[in-house]
Structures are given as C-alpha cells and as structure tokens.
Amino acid sequence: ADEEFKLDYITGAGGISIPEVAILEAKKEVAKFGEVTTRMNGFVRTLINDQDKKTRNKMFNKIMKYEEITDRVEVEVANYLDQVSRQEITPEVSAQIRSMLSITNDLERIGDIYYQISKTIERKDDKKIYFLPEKEKT
C-alpha cells in the first residue's frame, strides 16, 4: 500500500473550481504529506534501534521509496497550487498558497534528509561501525 501512494484530495486542472475550496483540499494533501515524513521518521528510528538484517533492509527500501514519494508529492502539490494561483484570488489565498509551497518544500527536504541518514547508516553498517559498543557483538 505504501508504494501506491497517491494524492487523495487534489486533482489536475479540471478539478479546480473555487480557489478557497481548492486551498482547503490542498491543505488536506499537505497534512497527509506530513504523515508521510512522520512515517519516514519511524523507519529511521527502526534502522538505528533494530539490528535484524532483514528488518533493516526492509527499512532501507521503504525510506528510498518514501523519498521518491516526497519528491513526487511536492511537485504535484506545487503544480496544483500554481494552477490555483492563476485564477483570480484574494491576498489571503495568495498568502496561503505561499505558505503551503514553503511547507511542501520543507517536507520534501525532510524526506531527503531521512534518505541521507539511511545512506549514512548503510555505509556505517558496511564498515562495521556501530552506535553502541554492545552492538558490535551481534
């Protein structure tokens, strides 16, 4: 189910009607985007705390997949908000669009950082370097 992630609340250009309604839908999508990065946090925590090789490989793969999802969602939300901004909008809607673009950029960057952390952990594992000395025995 994770690999099938898609936008639930916003659609292409044909789906934009009233800017205020479009903004509400985009807000829901941004909140859902936040949940994706929260899941990535859990995956990284598992990488740090779980030494089972199979579990760790699963987490590495999930983080890589989720990083791709964050890239895609940022672009799709930004494109949607760009379409909304081309309509006649109020200053308040314009400010909300700018805010959501900033948030989606930050969430995508968080996804990148989690991915970079996972790659660092992977390199650390390959070199048999451990966070805690007792992990060296396993």
Language model segments and positions:
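Cytosolic, long alpha-helical scaffolding segments
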Residues: 1-138
